[in-house]
């Protein structure tokens, strides 16, 4: 009698296990995507800070404008730039926004900061 009442229960357990495995896989994919986006944001911040520091070292140009240009070319937005003429370092903060995560709806954004020091002899 107990065999009849439990008939088909393995199918339900397997379906639930497949759903859990699918959600876990989607979560792992989302974490991977966030890590890649963070890496892109950090690279963009590094490039923008180096461009601003180069302008500070050479004294030819606008460091903030070059930092903005490099940030934009790397698909980020310049949030902050501490790179005044005459300074010995450039500190740049950029923001990268992205969508397309599987478990998190809407847009997310990541900030990255980089510092480049002007080292003149």
Locate the predicted segments by residue.
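Alpha-helical assembly-interface signal, strongest on the long, hydrophobic N-terminal helix that forms
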Residues: 1-64
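Arginine residue identity/basic-tract feature
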Residues: 7, 33, 38, 69, ...
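Short, structured secondary-structure boundary patches
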Residues: 27-28, 90-106
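A general secondary-structure boundary signal
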Residues: 41, 89, 109-110
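Residue-level preference for non-acidic, small/hydrophobic
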Residues: 45-46, 71, 114
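Short amphipathic secondary-structure patches
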Residues: 49-98
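Low-complexity, S/T/G/P-rich flexible repeat/linker segments used as non-globular hinges
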Residues: 101-121
């Amino acid at each position: 009698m107990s065999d009849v009442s439990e008939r088909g229960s393995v199918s339900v357990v397997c379906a639930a296990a497949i759903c859990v495995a699918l959600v876990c896989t989607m979560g792992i994919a989302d974490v991977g995507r966030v890590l890649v986006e963070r890496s892109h944001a950090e690279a963009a911040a590094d490039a923008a800070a180096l461009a601003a520091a180069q302008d500070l070292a050479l004294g030819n140009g606008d460091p903030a404008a070059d930092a903005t240009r490099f940030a934009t070319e790397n698909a980020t937005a310049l949030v902050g730039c501490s790179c005044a003429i005459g300074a010995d370092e450039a500190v740049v903060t950029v923001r990268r926004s992205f969508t397309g995560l599987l478990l998190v709806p809407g847009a997310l954004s990541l900030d990255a900061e980089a510092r480049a020091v002007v080292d003149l002899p």
